[in-house]
């Protein structure tokens, strides 16, 4: 069987594509949300009420971003550079110490 006259062209095109294109679903820098601030597009932001907080850490545990850390007393602190306003923290809070309020810019 004769070799296709287009084989060299196809191989060259495949090589160029694999060198130039990023395949989907591959994270070249896993965990890059720490590098790239992700909080600029939220519509709602968490507002914290310290007097209602029992320091259960559920907001910290369930936050899908690195947007909540705990201060030296164990109270949550929100990093609005990374908070996307998803509301999971407010939903998980058993004492309603976190309320989602409309973002004002």
Swiss-Prot record:
Q: At the top level of its lineage, which domain of life is listed? A: Archaea
Q: How is the cofactor bound?
A: Binds 2 [4Fe-4S] clusters.
Q: Read off the Gene3D superfamilies from this record.
A: 3.30.70.20
User: In this record, what's one Pfam family?
Assistant: Fer4_21
Q: Where is the 4Fe-4S ferredoxin-type domain?
A: 44-73, 74-103
Cofactor annotation: [4Fe-4S] cluster
Identify the residues that bind [4Fe-4S] cluster 2.
63, 83, 86, 89
Q: Which SUPFAM superfamilies match?
A: 4Fe-4S ferredoxins
Q: Which PROSITE patterns match?
A: 4FE4S_FER_1 (PS00198), 4FE4S_FER_2 (PS51379)
Binding of [4Fe-4S] cluster 1, residues: 53, 56, 59, 93
Can you list the disulfide-bonded cysteine pairs? Answer: none
UniProt-listed PANTHER family: PYRUVATE SYNTHASE SUBUNIT PORD
What's the protein name? Pyruvate synthase subunit PorD
- Species of origin: Pyrococcus abyssi (strain GE5 / Orsay)
Q: Which gene encodes it?
A: porD
């Amino acid at each position: 069987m004769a070799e296709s006259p287009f084989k060299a062209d196809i191989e060259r095109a495949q090589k160029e594509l694999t060198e130039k294109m990023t395949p989907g679903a591959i994270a070249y820098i896993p965990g890059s949300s720490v590098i790239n601030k992700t909080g600029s597009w939220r519509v709602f932001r968490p507002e914290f009420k310290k007097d209602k907080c029992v320091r259960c850490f559920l907001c910290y545990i369930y936050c899908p971003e690195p947007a909540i850390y705990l201060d030296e007393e164990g109270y949550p602190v929100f990093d609005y550079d990374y908070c996307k306003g998803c509301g999971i923290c407010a939903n998980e809070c058993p004492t309603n110490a976190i309320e989602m309020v409309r973002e004002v810019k």
